[in-house]
Amino acid sequence: MPALPAALLALLLHVHLCRPAPVNGSKWSYIGPDGEKVWPKKYPFCGGVFQSPIDFHNDILHYDSALLPVELEGYNVSSEVKFLLTNNGHSVKMNLSSAMRIRNFSFQYSAAQLHLHWGNRNKQEGSEHTISGRHFAAELHIVHYNSEQYVDLKSAVDKPNGLAVLAILMEEGDFNPSFEKIFSHFQHVKYKGQEAIVPGFNVRDLLPERLDDYYRYEGSLTTPPCYPSVLWTVFRKPVEVSVGQLLALETTLYCTESDDPSPLKMVDNFRRVQEFDERMVSVSFQQDPAPGEGSPGMFVSRALGTKYPPPRFSSGLSISSTCNCHCSDNTWDLLTS
């Protein structure tokens, strides 16, 4: 896949970063007066180009035989290592060791954290990326930063080639003991600001069996400030978690603090899919499509243009009205706080 020209991305980042950034304490949510429709007013990148998530459908897919299986290094973490699990008011986030790395990318990327996006108990459509319009129950993001060029996540988050995220789609199925190593601690992080210690485990077990079967494209953070600095690798086959595990995800957590007189459930914390003009998605597979992907056949790619029309929110898509979290945090707290 042709990489996003570094000079172009650097120019885009420079133009926006010359504008005053929102101060700490700016609010954002998924609906309501601070919802995603008004994100661009406070966070200009959210109304810009190369935005994520997107829908994967055949007319934007291009088979790339040069794509190699994702290789993991250091993902089997000793139980003596402790991960910090945090409710940051937008999601539940677990810090990871920088000794965890991914290979077969243009740069070396080291792990920083993972977090989840999900729906609600009445409508389990919580993934951010979709396949031919199909949502999955939830989505796990494992966030890595370019450790060849930057010292940490904070310094890489707004830079060209700064981040690489592995996205794992999740669907209802069998009980998943690996995800339970995280989910079993939810009672200790029910409210915003609460933390828990999770013993190390084999994080590889959170990923699908095949690491050579994925979509790849240049995109952005899916939360404010939406920097277009992410190389996305979205695995095609979802992993299974049980009904009970999904319910724990959808019913246990709050986006408010424990003493808030009006507690708000943390549900529907996913961004709607964005327009995908003048870009291509490279795929590592040519076999029959996964369920919901459409008919098999040759993938067609759009030419990568040099002009980028203003992005539009996809029509016909709605965000559930049950989520109304308004949080006063750092502008990119889902990644760094």
Residue ranges with predicted function:
Residues M1-S337:
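Alpha-carbonic anhydrase
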